[in-house]
């Protein structure tokens, strides 16, 4: 039967199962059980629920099944007809569509052969057990829930935000010995089928003993594995993952990992944050512009400083040039050695801060940086201006929302230090040209990394209102072109505005 028509629950259990399968095919997170109930085990039934949302052993569902198992078939049907289950919140649905909606609220749905209604047996719904707060993707406004190590729990967190039967959770296995559960989450009528097939093919193209984290999947499935720029977007936020799914993208989640992989992705996706869409467009645009500038300076600022001080001092105002010269008096090293000393010190502090326990790690990063910088200046190992430049560069890298994306700029920073120390501004231009050329040839599952500036026609570009600037939410009426969704329109109003 068409999904747009109301389908009554039938007394024929087989027909009800077929109708539920129409909605929940390719849903590895939906538990479907056919069983026999009754004292004589002669009453066929079909039970379905989101796996992590119901505990059959201790919940109301378990008590209900135990009660029905003590009755005869006629008594079971009579009990259901008279609504005498003894559960105050039990709901009876006359149509399949209502049963589908009830299932997506996190409750269990029971069909009994010979009974023309579906029974929703109340439970705790979507639980909070095991859900952690996100540390790596802090937002000013929005949910604090984060993914955990259970792939089933993570899929339920996405379903909690998108209660549609069109959300599919395709289950795969990875690792010959580990046999790790991998889920592909997408919206059936939005995600491009070719994209889903390509992702599934890439994930099955290799054989390995074990997959212990989603990072291993990421490295094995990337085509241009040598690039410092990630071709998979990572997230620990269920709301970020749900937002990507609604754009027509696909989420890859791996058991024992709290990190979801978003595909395809592009440069701009790494700059956006979840609260860009929860805040007013003026605030979101300002923050986004800062992050774009931060990504540029995190890569080029130390190299720019070396180019100015070593090759192009004539472009500086005289007073500023004298200030630079005075600051470097007594420093025994050339400028490039100064910069490398401070950069490596900051990177070492950052690494130490990550490895140490929470509060201690933060203390090492902040206090250690201040102490080392001050001591280095007082010992005439580096000039104060270098400490300022390196500190500002570190701040810029912290402003980039995605850690893997920020790491790419941290690596390229040393490339720019080398070419600028050797060739000055000419080296800076060559470096920028090399990075831009690399980015223009980089793709994520066939989607250009610099979309829509590369690989899109003018109409696609005009449709996009969500890049460096974020236009008012009411104007963001089309899904991004880079995901190539089946349906582009995502927002309509009843009256023209």
Predicted regions: what is each one?
Residues 1-300, 314, 318, 438-497:
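Membrane-embedded alpha-helical signal segments
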Residues 304, 317-497:
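Generic detector of multi-pass transmembrane helix bundles and their immediately adjacent loops
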């Amino acid at each position: 039967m068409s999904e747009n028509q109301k389908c009554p629950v039938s007394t024929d259990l087989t027909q009800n199962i077929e109708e539920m399968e129409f909605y929940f095919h390719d849903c590895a997170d939906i538990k479907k059980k056919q069983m026999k109930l009754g004292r004589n085990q002669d009453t066929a039934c079909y039970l379905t629920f989101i796996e992590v949302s119901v505990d059959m052993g201790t919940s109301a569902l378990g008590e209900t099944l135990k009660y029905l198992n003590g009755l005869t078939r006629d008594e079971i049907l009579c009990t259901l007809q008279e609504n005498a289950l003894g559960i105050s919140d039990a709901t009876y649905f006359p149509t399949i569509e209502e049963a589908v909606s009830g299932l997506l609220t996190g409750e269990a749905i029971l069909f009994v052969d010979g009974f023309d209604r579906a029974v929703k047996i109340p439970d705790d719904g979507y639980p909070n057990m095991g859900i952690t707060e996100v540390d790596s993707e802090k937002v000013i406004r929005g949910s604090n829930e984060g993914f955990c190590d259970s792939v089933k729990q993570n899929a339920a967190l996405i379903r909690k935000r998108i209660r549609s039967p069109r959300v599919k959770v395709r289950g795969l296995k990875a690792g010959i010995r580990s046999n790790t559960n991998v889920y592909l989450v997408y919206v059936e009528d939005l995600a491009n089928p070719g994209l889903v097939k390509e992702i599934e093919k890439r994930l099955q193209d290799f054989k390995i003993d074990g997959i212990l984290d989603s990072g291993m999947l990421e490295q094995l499935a990337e085509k241009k594995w040598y690039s410092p720029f990630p071709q998979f977007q990572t997230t620990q936020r269920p709301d970020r993952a749900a937002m990507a799914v609604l754009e027509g993208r696909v989420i890859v989640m791996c058991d024992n990992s709290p990190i979801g992989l978003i595909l395809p992705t592009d440069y701009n996706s790494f700059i956006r944050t979840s609260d860009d869409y929860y805040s007013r467009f003026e605030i979101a645009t300002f923050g986004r512009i800062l992050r774009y500038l931060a990504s540029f300076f995190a890569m080029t600022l130390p190299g720019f400083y070396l180019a100015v001080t070593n090759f192009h001092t004539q472009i500086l105002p005289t007073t500023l040039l004298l200030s630079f010269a005075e600051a470097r008096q007594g420093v025994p090293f050339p400028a490039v050695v100064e910069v490398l000393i401070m950069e490596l010190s900051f990177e070492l502090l950052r690494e130490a801060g990550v490895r140490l326990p929470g509060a201690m790690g933060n203390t090492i990063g902040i206090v250690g940086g201040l102490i080392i910088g001050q001591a280095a200046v007082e010992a005439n190992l580096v000039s104060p201006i270098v400490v300022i430049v390196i500190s500002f560069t570190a701040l810029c890298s912290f402003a980039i929302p995605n850690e893997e994306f920020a790491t790419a700029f941290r690596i390229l920073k040393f490339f720019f230090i080398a070419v600028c120390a050797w060739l000055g501004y000419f080296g800076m231009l060559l470096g920028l040209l090399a990075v831009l050329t690399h980015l223009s040839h980089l793709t994520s599952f066939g989607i250009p990394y610099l979309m829509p500036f590369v690989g899109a026609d003018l109409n696609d570009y005009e449709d996009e209102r969500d890049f460096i600037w974020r236009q008012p939410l009411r104007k963001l009426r089309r899904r991004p072109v880079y995901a190539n969704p089946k349906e582009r329109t995502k927002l309509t109003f009843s009256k023209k505005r």
